[in-house]
Amino acid sequence: MKTKYIFGASLPRSGTKLYTYALSANKKIMMASNPNIELFKFLKKENSEIFKKRKKLKNLKTNYMMEDYYGSYKKSDMLQHILRSNLNIKFKENIKEFRNKSYIRSKREIKDLSLHMKKISGKTFKELFEDQIKIIKKRSKNDPQWLGFSESWVIEFFPAIARSFPDAKFLINIRDPRATIYANQNVRKKSKIAQILSYSRHFRKQIALANSYLKSKHLKNRIHIFTYESLVFYPKKTIKRICKFLDVRFDSKSTQYKNIYDFQNKENFKGASISLIPLSNFDKKRTYFWKQNINDNILKYIEFLCYHELKACGYKLFNNLETLLTKNKKKIKESFKKDLLRKVNWRSDSGNPKKEIRFEFSRHTKKKVTKTKDIKKYFINDDFYKIKLKNKKINTF
């Protein structure tokens, strides 16, 4: 049987290793966790250059940063360009630089394969993706039916991948951002702490695009959305659904922790959690550790930023929007300023606190957004805006 490709999207601290390693316990599946974000950074840069040239935007600064696409008409237009693209784009950057960055990054997530990253090659991005998957295949002792990887921040590239690989399928893993942001803000290495606003916007982007993909011409029936919480609380049911989606027989090894193997450390998977609770199973206690420990002002700030998306996912909110906008307005603005003025290694905002605060509050206070370009600026797409207006939920498992 011909091997097909599988691609996943999630955000950091969302259980990407857990679900990819669990699925890889099934001999029909092999997935790697976050093997090469540089592949997407270089792809984003090249798409930006093409977009700049087509739109004749001389002053547009192109870079490798993974965008959230909120708050700017140009960013919204760039997202539409990426959503209409494919991987048949020539690789024009310095291949040695790309290999070196890929190698350095791989030592953090797939160090068992990192030496192979020094030789990754391809004339187009499609060929680079294929070569990346060939490297991942080296982990498998047989010919799996499904082969691929999951990466963070990159959900906007799913349509391009779908056009280039017509038989590929896609997984989207969602986790409550209050849990992931709490975990990120409390990591030991302070250099890994992200800006809360930027992380929240990437979560919003993930939800808006995931919902639209369920109706997409290129992705309909090729995409499966599940939550980290469902994986932890109902592992057998959740993994069975994924196996059904992939048309492979469920293997109970995927839900037996003793069989979940950490490929890069060459040992049984132990997980990584700021709770410091030892991991020996699909642990419910660790999942909600954040609820007893998160700072109340940070909780309000996150719920303010992700209010509509949390509701759309069915997550229970501790605060209602009206209270956040009135009684807690001052505290939220203080959290905003503290977050935006703090030095971090990664952020995707404009760097202008007043502009960002004004934008986020107007996103909530505008009674109705009518212009398509404004809907995209505030909510990414019309599909999610309709969900917000009608108080509906997206389909997750």
Where in this protein do the model-derived segments appear?
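Short gly/pro/ser/thr-enriched loop/turn and capping motifs at secondary-structure boundaries
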Residues: 37-40, 178-181, 257-259
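PAPS-dependent sulfotransferases, especially Golgi type II membrane carbohydrate sulfotransferases
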Residues: 1-6, 248-397
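Generic beta-sheet signal
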Residues: 32-34, 173
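Phosphate/oxyanion-binding loops and surfaces in catalytic or ligand/nucleic-acid-binding neighborhoods
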Residues: 26-32, 46-49, 57, 187, ...
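A conserved segment at the C-terminal end of the G1
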Residues: 17-29
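PAPS-dependent sulfotransferase catalytic domain
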Residues: 7, 100-254, 264-279
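PAPS-dependent sulfation machinery
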Residues: 34-149
